[in-house]
Amino acid sequence: MSSISARIPAPLRSLLSRGLGSALLSGLAGVFVLTLGGKVVSFVKDAFVVSTFGVSDQLDVFMLVFGFVTFAASLLAGGLPESFLPAYVELKLQKGARRADRMAVQTSACHLLSLLMAALVLIMIVHMLIGHLAHGFDETKKQLAQQLVVRLLPFLLCFGMSFQFSAWLRANKKFFIVAASPLLVPLTTVSVMLVTLRAPDVNALVLGANLGAAFQLCLMLSAISSQLP
């Protein structure tokens, strides 16, 4: 190894040694590990859920509803939070952090309002929606799906707001919090299922998803509040 490094020109070797020890590279490595860990934990959670429930009508219904709610939250997050990031950075450079944070609070309130309106619309059209999404289900499974849509609305609100807070934190270079917070959803779900392992049902999945998203949101809020004046 030393013979290989000896063949590298001195300026390049010096640059590499400084780069490998830099805080920036260490931060990138940490974010990479956390992001990769999040994918692994999510896979383990899914495998644990499948092994626990096996072939189950409840699991079929939950996966359908959870997938739709996650898609709806991600779809709503594709608008305001994504356009917020460049506007926040530009305003912070031109007018200062206080003015930019004020805009961030206003934008977060608008995004929360849009999520609340979406939740209200879902409540009003849940019967028609499930009729189209779950047309192959029997009546019992359709009724369960309608109940799960309503019961997963806290997840919709918390998960949807996490996109806004994620953009806010990324704008302030809080990459570790952004990378680590998604771990809380699968970890909480697995924890709740372990507590109820003797009699697992769909209620554990709903509780785990709602609690995990709430914990994720609280972690982000804590990080944001610590940087506000």
Residue ranges of model-derived segments:
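Membrane-embedded alpha-helical bundles of multi-pass transporters/translocases
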Residues: 2-229
